[in-house]
């Protein structure tokens, strides 16, 4: 999965997919009442990027739905996975469940079109704080209450705070999650970060009894870093330059080892070599 980083304006969806991304990451900010409000990152953000692009969250969802609904004039068949980077740092811990409920209602209405031929992309809810694990239950309970438990087949989870792998496992246990787990590891492109924790996450994924299904590394903009990440066995790389990742994947060392994921590749099933 080549994951386009910080895709917060609707026009950027096409821009990143046309550069080679089959997945995008979108920031979601919340208002004081835990309503998802804008697709917005703000300052500071990655080096070389504008931090200030934004849409109203519901408008972005409608644009995303168009891009991921077969038959729509804006349809992009390659776009199969969307990571919502939930900026829950602005919320009190006791608002996490409420944020999950509201997120579920927004997605159900504006993205899934109330279960009637909505967008088809898989969704990952990425949460920066382990203490906000109740967001997951708020989300899953709401989809069930609204009569659409089947949509949970399209939803996965990520804790993005670079916490110890054992602590992340405990948070999932509390949230009642087993399966559909992506594990991110990374840092802004302005700084360097080694692959120690990525390798630990990959080992958990491949152990047969770990909690992780897929591992992605962010933010990868350089060819050398891309090679290191691919060598470490990641499933996804998040990048500001999808074309760079695509180029590396076409190099002799990689073109017979890795390929771009398609809609038929489940993002929840651990790939067995």
UniProtKB/Swiss-Prot annotation:
GO terms for biological process: killing of cells of another organism; lipid catabolic process. Coiled coil: none annotated. Its cofactor is Mg(2+). It is an enzyme of class 4 (lyase). The active site is at residues 5, 41. It catalyses: an N-(acyl)-sphingosylphosphocholine = an N-(acyl)-sphingosyl-1,3-cyclic phosphate + choline; an N-(acyl)-sphingosylphosphoethanolamine = an N-(acyl)-sphingosyl-1,3-cyclic phosphate + ethanolamine; a 1-acyl-sn-glycero-3-phosphocholine = a 1-acyl-sn-glycero-2,3-cyclic phosphate + choline; a 1-acyl-sn-glycero-3-phosphoethanolamine = a 1-acyl-sn-glycero-2,3-cyclic phosphate + ethanolamine. GO terms for cellular component: extracellular region. The keyword Magnesium applies. Belongs to the arthropod phospholipase D family. Class II subfamily. This is Dermonecrotic toxin LhSicTox-alphaIA2ai. It comes from Loxosceles hirsuta. The lineage of its organism: Eukaryota, Metazoa, Ecdysozoa, Arthropoda, Chelicerata.
